[in-house]
Amino acid sequence: MDFEEDYDAEFDDNQEGQLETPFPSVAGADDGDNDNDDSVAENMKKKQKREAVVDDGSENAFGIPEFTRKDKTLEEILEMMDSTPPIIPDAVIDYYLTKNGFNVADVRVKRLLALATQKFVSDIAKDAYEYSRIRSSVAVSNANNSQARARQLLQGQQQPGVQQISQQQHQQNEKTTASKVVLTVNDLSSAVAEYGLNIGRPDFYR
């Protein structure tokens, strides 16, 4: 009986010791799960940061220059005004803004207004050039018209001296127009008329 009691007591002590000792395999598995969770969280943070950077435009994954993006914020445009000023000088901008009662301390805002003015003038010049080309093509078609040439010959027979002078002037005009493009006030008035501006002569002067 004493042997059985000693064996039972030893068995109970061993069982309690096994219950108190931690399981190393389970603890290792928990550490692995924590490491996996940390790595997944880090990957998600890196992905979100990369997407935020690309959406912000501060960094480009494909190496495309910054100025190729068409959609820019006002802050980005103002930052570009520091390094890339417009064609209109700052002194001219200050003069006309002061003349019209517009006082701004920030130079970038002034340059932004100058850039808008530059774009407006460029569009008007392009439109005036197109009107000049249309006018030149109409003049060439009238010169190639047989009826117009017959009318000029008839006038030359009636007034030979005037016809000779007009032919010389016409040849000189052809030489000059072939070498350069002439923009007239009529071309400019037709171009700015699309923007609601009337710079033509009033009707009572005609």
From Swiss-Prot:
Question: Where are the stretches annotated Disordered?
Answer: 1-57
* CDD domains named in the record: HFD_TAF10 (cd07982)
* Molecular function terms, GO-annotated: chromatin binding; identical protein binding; molecular adaptor activity; promoter-specific chromatin binding
Q: Which residues carry this modification: Phosphoserine?
A: 58, 146
Q: What's an example Gene Ontology biological process for this entry?
A: positive regulation of transcription by RNA polymerase II
- Specify the Histone-fold domain's residue ranges: 47-194
InterPro entries per record: TAF10
Question: Which residue windows does the record flag with biased composition (Acidic residues)?
Answer: 1-15, 30-40
Where found? Nucleus
Q: Which UniProt keywords apply?
A: Nucleus, Phosphoprotein, Transcription, Transcription regulation
Pfam families, alphabetized: TAF10
Example GO CC term: the record gives: SLIK (SAGA-like) complex
Keyword Phosphoprotein among UniProt keywords: yes
On assembly, the entry states: Component of the 1.8 MDa SAGA (Spt-Ada-Gcn5 acetyltransferase) complex, which is composed of 19 subunits TRA1, SPT7, TAF5, NGG1/ADA3, SGF73, SPT20/ADA5, SPT8, TAF12, TAF6, HFI1/ADA1, UBP8, GCN5, ADA2, SPT3, SGF29, TAF10, TAF9, SGF11 and SUS1.
Q: What does this protein do?
A: Functions as a component of both the DNA-binding general transcription initiation factor complex TFIID and the transcription coactivator SAGA complex. Binding of TFIID to a promoter (with or without TATA element) is the initial step in pre-initiation complex (PIC) formation.
Q: Which family does it belong to?
A: Belongs to the TAF10 family.
Tell what the record comments on domains: The histone-fold domain (HFD) mediates heterodimerization with TFIID-specific components TAF47 and TAF65 as well as SAGA-specific component SPT7.
What other note does the entry give for this protein? Answer: Present with 3400 molecules/cell in log phase SD medium.
Q: Per its record, how is this protein called by name?
A: SAGA complex/transcription factor TFIID complex subunit TAF10
The scientific name of the source species is Saccharomyces cerevisiae (strain ATCC 204508 / S288c) (Baker's yeast)
Q: What is the lineage of its organism?
A: Eukaryota, Fungi, Dikarya, Ascomycota, Saccharomycotina
